[in-house]
């Protein structure tokens, strides 16, 4: 028997032993691998390779282990998936024993991570989609936490493990290779640092509240469409160290207080201070009343050839000013806010302030008790053109306005749609492009021409030569164009010619104004960039100093550990000598 066949046989027998164990009651179908037609590799999971395949005339995803070390994760996922049945958890159709693989529901929309940060063109999505994804995720996790006789902890909640179907409107949780029973203690750190609760990598004791922490990070990520702790960079231990010291993702300007409160409660250092997933489901279900349109399929950017737009996705919420927060007990300082440069966001903010003033006595009814972090540092704005996060600038006004009677007031979802950047526009360095609502509209209709228009070509002077009357008036607005003259009246012709020349001069002045304004914007942008460069230089100096201090602290800690190790070794040698 070959090595490959021996490994396959060993995997098969191991899986078979686990499946047939009397203590395990697994609800799945054993599938003959010959019935499966593998089409293509689509990615990797908690273990092995994930492939798209056909099984009984339907699309499925199959997970195959690649090594013996992945067999344990395979058994874990098989055992956990066979226990669950929920619309927001990927469905297990069955398993093959030779070769060992899982046959599961196929998600044509890919992972939430790819929708947020994948290759272009990226889809547009609204605040309703973002809130709906988080609600569905919380519903699936709440189901896991409430399972009997033993609840489940996922332990690896993150956008790569959240799949989308039905045009991106339905979310399903996958990758149970790291899931465990709620009584289990962690023996080796699994999961991903950016979404991992501090207690998970600080020690081995943790509860289902570690999934709550991960969910709070995901909520921030889908609203901002930014990778959590992306500004820290480097290896994973740097993120772990920052989270251990109380660093959290930056707060979001214009985010409604109920959402911000829920999000920051999930980030609490103390797991007991975090809400349960059941409470999160109740709060999110209530908030979803203010976010209509979550059932609309995701839209991908189309090509606007007449405007010279690229099909790269842009930000839906780039007006949101962000400031980093640290959850240590310090006062808020150095809050840097990026000014909104577009009139639309200013109008939204004014609406928000008006509604807050009118409903100030009632607004407290929806307060969830903020646990906002304190020590604030500036997060450098991202300049990636593919940002398309959900704009929350108007939602709080809508929540406050309905707090009195509890009935949602219908507002246009267009207030929350994505924005685009026109290539000819000069935006601020805060990646705050001007707003372009996503509405299907035809080309701008031209102004109707006058009936029987008179043109200069129809007229000649008394000497029979053509008049060189400027044609600039044809580009003016209809109300500014000169009236057609009477060809038989010299006075009328003279007035018309004078009007045409004035129109040409008017167009020349307007063109100069436009060019000067454009140059002004360029100079402002250059000045802004210079200021940003100075700020970045200062930030880099501070970061370098911080890293030096951190390195010194770690070196000291290393020396202490080294001394402790030497003491322990010497004690052991003494014991061995005496024995």
Curated annotation (Swiss-Prot):
Bias (Polar residues): 306-338, 416-425
Stated family: Belongs to the protein kinase superfamily. STE Ser/Thr protein kinase family. MAP kinase kinase kinase subfamily.
Organism: Mus musculus
Encoding gene, per UniProt annotation: Map3k7
Ranges of Low complexity composition bias in the record: 361-375, 426-436
Subcellular location: Cytoplasm; Cell membrane
Region feature Interaction with MAPK8IP1, mapped onto this chain: 1-300
Name used for this protein in its record: Mitogen-activated protein kinase kinase kinase 7
Pfam families in the cross-refs: PK_Tyr_Ser-Thr
């Amino acid at each position: 028997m070959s090595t490959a066949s021996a490994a396959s046989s060993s995997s098969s027998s191991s899986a078979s032993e686990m499946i047939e164990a009397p203590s395990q009651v697994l609800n799945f179908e054993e599938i003959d691998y010959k019935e499966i037609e593998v089409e293509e590799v689509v990615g990797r999971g908690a273990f092995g390779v994930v492939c798209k395949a056909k099984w009984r005339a339907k699309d499925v995803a199959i997970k195959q282990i690649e090594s013996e070390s992945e067999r344990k994760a395979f058994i874990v996922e098989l055992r956990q998936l066979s226990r669950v049945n929920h619309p927001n958890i990927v469905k297990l159709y069955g398993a093959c024993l030779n070769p060992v693989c899982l046959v599961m529901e196929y998600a044509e929309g890919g992972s939430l991570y790819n929708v947020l940060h994948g290759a272009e063109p990226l889809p547009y999505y609204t605040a309703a989609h973002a809130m709906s994804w988080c609600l569905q995720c919380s519903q699936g996790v709440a189901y896991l936490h409430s399972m009997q006789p033993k609840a489940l902890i996922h332990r690896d909640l993150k956008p790569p493990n959240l799949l989308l179907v039905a045009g991106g409107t339905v979310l399903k949780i996958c990758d149970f290779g790291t899931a465990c029973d709620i009584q289990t203690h962690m023996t080796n750190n699994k999961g991903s640092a950016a979404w991992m609760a501090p207690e998970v990598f600080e020690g081995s004791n943790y509860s289902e509240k570690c999934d709550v922490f991960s969910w709070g990070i995901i909520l921030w990520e889908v609203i901002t469409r930014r990778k959590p702790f992306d500004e820290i960079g480097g290896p994973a231990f740097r993120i772990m160290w920052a989270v251990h010291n109380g660093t959290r993702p930056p707060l979001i300007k214009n985010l409604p207080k109920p959402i911000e409160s829920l999000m920051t409660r999930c980030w609490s250092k103390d797991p007991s201070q975090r809400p349960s997933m059941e409470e999160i489901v109740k709060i999110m279900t209530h908030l979803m009343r203010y976010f209509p349109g979550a059932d609309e399929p995701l839209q991908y950017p189309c090509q606007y050839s007449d405007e010279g737009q690229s099909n790269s996705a842009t930000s839906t919420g780039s007006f949101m000013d962000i400031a980093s927060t640290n959850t240590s007990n310090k006062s808020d300082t150095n809050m840097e806010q990026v000014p909104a440069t577009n009139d639309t966001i200013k109008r939204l903010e004014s609406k928000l302030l008006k509604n807050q003033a009118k409903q100030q006595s009632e607004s407290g009814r929806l307060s969830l008790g903020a646990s906002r972090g304190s020590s604030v540092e500036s997060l450098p704005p991202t300049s990636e053109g593919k940002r398309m996060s959900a704009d929350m600038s108007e939602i709080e006004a809508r929540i406050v306005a309905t707090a009195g009677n509890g009935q949602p007031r219908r507002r246009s979802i267009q207030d929350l749609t994505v924005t685009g950047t026109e290539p000819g526009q000069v935006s601020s360095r805060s990646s705050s492009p001007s707003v372009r609502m996503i509405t299907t509209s035809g080309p701008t209709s031209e102004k109707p021409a006058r009936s029987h228009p008179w043109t200069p070509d129809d007229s000649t002077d008394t000497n029979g030569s053509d008049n060189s009357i400027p044609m600039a008036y044809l580009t003016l607005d209809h109300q500014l164009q000169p009236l057609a003259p009477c060809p038989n009246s010299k006075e009328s012709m003279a007035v018309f010619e004078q009007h045409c020349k004035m129109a040409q001069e008017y167009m020349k002045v307007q063109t100069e104004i436009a060019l000067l304004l454009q140059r002004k914007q360029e100079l402002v942008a250059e000045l802004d960039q210079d200021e940003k460069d100075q700020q970045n230089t200062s930030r880099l100096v501070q970061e370098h100093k911080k890293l030096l201090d951190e390195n010194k602290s770690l070196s000291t800690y290393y020396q202490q550990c080294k001394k402790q190790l030497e003491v322990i070794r010497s004690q052991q040698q003494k014991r061995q000598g005496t024995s």
